[in-house]
Amino acid sequence: MISSQEAFEEIKRGAVEIIHEDELLSRLAEEKPLRIKLGFDPTAPDIHLGHTVVLNKLRQFQTLGHEVIFLIGDFTAMIGDPTGKNITRQPLTREIVMENTKTYETQAFRILDPDKTQVTSNSTWINKLKADDLVRLAATYTVARMLERDDFNKRYLSQQPIAIHEFLYPLLQGYDSVALKADVELGGTDQKFNLLVGRELQKHFGQRPQCVLTVPLLEGLDGIQKMSKSLNNYIGITEPPEEMFGKVMSISDELMWRYYELLSFRPMREINRWREEVSEGRNPRDIKILLAEELVTRFHSKEAATKAHQHFIDRFKRHELPTDLDEIELTAENTHLTIGYILQRAGLVNTTSEGLRMIAQGAVRIDGERVEDIKLAIPRGESHLFQVGKRRFAKVKVI
């Protein structure tokens, strides 16, 4: 059994903010199971890797012996979370919400232990609230406090409409914490306001206020906007293994480290060691393959990951990469050769500077994988297929 301090350090990994750290540490020191709440509104039928960042954190609490509550916001989904929106969301029908709800529990159990997870829906208690209950609940918060929210404030200042029911959303989400007597609530950084409303309402109802733990929002495949099905930059956890593997391999080398930090269960010391090796010349593609294999194994199986890896290799050989090239041997005086030098000596570009320029333009690939690092070095003993543009190829071995 680990100490409360060790448990706290494990919980803290990957968290953006804990409100308040001393409160959480004190509660962990009580050595009693805490009630950990995580809510999801079933606004779409599928869970993607972005959702799993906070689900992994919930699983962490579960592994430490705490009571985890997977709350399906079937009522609040019909309101629509206004967080980050510059217009009023169209409310979903109950039929759509219930259809989406069917898949959420099954998908969540790919991460959570079903035997140790309490699943509940907030319609259970919200549907029982009467009109006077809602009026009293609304009286606990002022319009001025609501307008402290960045999204509401921007809409107010730009004279964009804010519907009254949107003000109810954070109040009802906060009331969920009262109904569940939550000790800790988890959420993305964009949910901070809503989570803090839960703290305030618990105080109002005479409960010990929950601690709040926020986790980062995972960037989508584009590396810019947060992962979202509506932006088509997502990886769904129920996608076929080959598709999941290929999507992971398509992310940039820099984004790969972000995915390792937020999605991988590997120790940070191991990830940091790989990062150092890449900075010294190791091909980041090799590290990315390990990430793809880990994620496919988690959501499918080890066998599926092996097949997906082979499918990925075969696809590039079949559709993009020639296999009948004579191998060119280039001698490294030290332990490696730089990418610019290899491209120039292999006849793929006229000068080293042209090679670096082509890398910056995204026109250089190694074994079908786009190169982004102009300082990439290939160690002695490795053989790869280099590509510039669509038609220039060379098979090179560094000796």
Curated annotation (Swiss-Prot):
It is found in: Cytoplasm. A motif ('KMSKS' region) lies at residues 226-230. SUPFAM superfamilies: Alpha-L RNA-binding motif, Nucleotidylyl transferase. Its EC number is 6.1.1.1. It catalyses: tRNA(Tyr) + L-tyrosine + ATP = L-tyrosyl-tRNA(Tyr) + AMP + diphosphate + H(+). ATP binds at residue 229. Pfam families: S4, tRNA-synt_1b. GO terms for biological process: tRNA aminoacylation; tyrosyl-tRNA aminoacylation. PROSITE patterns: AA_TRNA_LIGASE_I, S4. Residues 337-398 form the S4 RNA-binding domain. One of its GO terms (molecular function) is ATP binding. CDD domains: S4 (cd00165), TyrRS_core (cd00805). A motif ('HIGH' region) lies at residues 42-51. GO terms for cellular component: cytosol. Belongs to the class-I aminoacyl-tRNA synthetase family. TyrS type 2 subfamily. Catalyzes the attachment of tyrosine to tRNA(Tyr) in a two-step reaction: tyrosine is first activated by ATP to form Tyr-AMP and then transferred to the acceptor end of tRNA(Tyr). Homodimer. This is Tyrosine--tRNA ligase.
